[in-house]
Amino acid sequence: MPFWYSNSKLIWLLSPFSLLFWLISQLRHALFCLGIKSSYRAPKPVIIVGNLSVGGNGKTPVVVWLVEELKKRGLRVGVISRGYGSKSKTYPLFVTENTRPIEGGDEPVLIAKRTNAPVVISPNRQQAIELLLSQAECDIIVSDDGLQHYKLQRDLEIVVMDAERALGNGFVLPAGPLRELPSRLKSVDFVITNGGKNQYSDAVMYLVPHFAINLKTNEKRQLKEFQSGVAIAGIGNPQRFFTMLEKLGIQLERTQAFQDHQHFEASQLEKLAENQPLFMTEKDAVKCQSFANDNWWYVPVDAEIIEAEKQCENLPHFWDKIDKLVAQYRNG
C-alpha cells in the first residue's frame, strides 16, 4: 500500500487495528516461548529465510543463493515452503520443476527448477519436513518464509529487506507493512538488504540479470540485443523489474503490474504484447511456459551478496555458524 511509505492520515485511522494486531501476535509469540503452545523441533538444522514486512523484498533469490552455497559446501539441502498460490487438493506435496505452478506454487517450482533441491510444500511445516526427510537425504533444511511461523523451531533466521523501502512507516499491519515491530531484527541472525545498504544491513544483495530466455524455444539472447518491448510482472514489487529493464537500455512501450502470485491466461498477455517482445520475471515464466508465444522472454537474475561494510566478517561468521550447527546435529 502506498500510504505505508508516506505520512498519510490513513495511518492514524488504522493505528488502533495495528495495536490489536500487535497485541494478538505478541500474545501468540509469548505462548510459544513459554511452551503453552507446542512447537516442532526438526531432526535436522532449520534455516528460516523470511521478511519482516509484506511485499516483494527479494526472498526467493536469497533462498536460491543460499541453497546453492550450501550445496557448494558439500551439504545435502532440502527446502520447505507454505506454497503461496498453490491450489493443491492434498498436502504435503513434493514439488519438482515439472509440477504445475497452480498446484506447487510459483516460487517453490522456481526454487526446484533453479536448485534441483528437493522441495516440499504444506501449510503444516512439520508435515512438510516429515515428508521431505522420508524421501530425501538432507543435512540441513531451508524454510522459504516462515519467520512468524513459531510452530516451527529454527536454528538460524535470515531477514530479507528492500533497502529503499526498508521498514516503511514502522507500523505493523494494517497501518503499516510490518508483520512484527522493528525490534524483532535484534533477535535474527542475519539481515540482507536488497538493492543497497541501510542501517540494518549485514550484507547487501544485488540482483544481476545476464540474458533473456525465450519461453517457447529456450533460446538465450543478450539483453543488449533488445531495444524496446513490453513488460509484465506479478511479483511483490513490479516496479523494481521494470526499472531494471530500463537501466539495461530497453525502452518499455508498456508495463503491466499484476498482483503477486497471479495466475495468468494466454489472452491476458497476448493483448499486451501484440508484435513486440514481452518480458517477464522467471517467477512469472513458470506459470506461462505452457501457453507461451514466440515473442515472450523471461529474465532470470542471480543474487550477488556482499558484505555491507569493507573489512566486515559477517558472512564468514554466518558460514561458521552453519558448520557448527551441522556438526552439532550430526554428533547428536
Swiss-Prot record:
Annotated residues that bind ATP are located at S53, V54, G55, G56, N57, G58, K59, T60
UniProt pathway: Glycolipid biosynthesis; lipid IV(A) biosynthesis; lipid IV(A) from (3R)-3-hydroxytetradecanoyl-[acyl-carrier-protein] and UDP-N-acetyl-alpha-D-glucosamine: step 6/6
* Cellular component, GO annotation: plasma membrane
Q: What class of enzyme is it?
A: transferase
Would the keyword Plastid turn up in this protein's UniProt record? no
Q: State the reactions this protein catalyses.
A: a lipid A disaccharide + ATP = a lipid IVA + ADP + H(+)
Alphabetical list of Pfam families matching this protein: LpxK
Q: What is its EC number?
A: 2.7.1.130
Keywords carried by this UniProt record: ATP-binding, Kinase, Lipid A biosynthesis, Lipid biosynthesis, Lipid metabolism, Nucleotide-binding, Transferase
Q: Which domain of life is it from?
A: Bacteria
Q: Which InterPro entries match?
A: LpxK, P-loop_NTPase
- Listed GO MF terms: ATP binding; tetraacyldisaccharide 4'-kinase activity
Task: Please provide the Gene Ontology terms (biological process) for this protein.
Answer: lipid A biosynthetic process; lipopolysaccharide core region biosynthetic process
Give all cystine bridges in this chain.
none
Q: Which family does it belong to?
A: Belongs to the LpxK family.
As for what it does, the entry says: Transfers the gamma-phosphate of ATP to the 4'-position of a tetraacyldisaccharide 1-phosphate intermediate (termed DS-1-P) to form tetraacyldisaccharide 1,4'-bis-phosphate (lipid IVA).
Report the HAMAP family cross-referenced here: LpxK (MF_00409)
The molecule here is called Tetraacyldisaccharide 4'-kinase
